[in-house]
Amino acid sequence: MTWGALALGVGLIVAFAMPSYRQGEASIAGTTAKDFKLELAGKPTHLSDLRGKVVVLNFWASWCPPCVEEAPSLNRLQRYIEPRNALVLGVAADEDAYAFSKFLVDQGVSFPTYRDPGAKDRGSPIALSYGTSVIPETYVVDRHGKIVRKIIGPQQWDSPDMRAYFDSLLAQN
């Protein structure tokens, strides 16, 4: 087999796989965000208790380099959206409580963050309930508790495009 034939074969696989991947991603839009119990500001609560707010639900871990990369822009996004009844909510897949706490301090995390106490072997039961197997992964949840967007991988959360997206979303009832 020549290199050209191999490249063509790989290209065809990618070309046919990508549309189904995108369709799968789109299919989550409009579904109700899975509820889970967490502790915020020392008080037990549920994700569903945050209805009425736009929630940027970010799954991350301290051992994840892309999560470290995007943490500063998530902090800036939190400052940008918080005055408009929205928040970034982090859920960490850290089994190690010390590593989790150190990450929060080292990165100056300013958004509410919860360590999934069931996290083991680099996995979070809460993240897995969403179908998340790669982190960072983020779900944007509207004021009605519906998922409106799923974003895989690190982002520049305070970029002009992201700000425009959140401006539009926050302008909706």
Annotate the PLM regions.
Residues 1-37, 173:
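N-terminal targeting signals for export/organelle localization
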Residues 35-55, 78-81:
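A short beta-strand-turn-helix
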Residues 36, 45, 59-60, 103, ...:
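Conserved hydrophobic/aromatic "anchor" residues
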Residues 53-55, 60-63, 134:
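Short pre-active-site segment immediately N-terminal to redox-active cysteine/selenocysteine motifs
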Residues 68-108, 118-128, 164:
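Structural microenvironment flanking redox-active thiols in thiol-disulfide oxidoreductases
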Residues 102-109, 116-168:
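Thiol/disulfide oxidoreductase modules built on the thioredoxin-like
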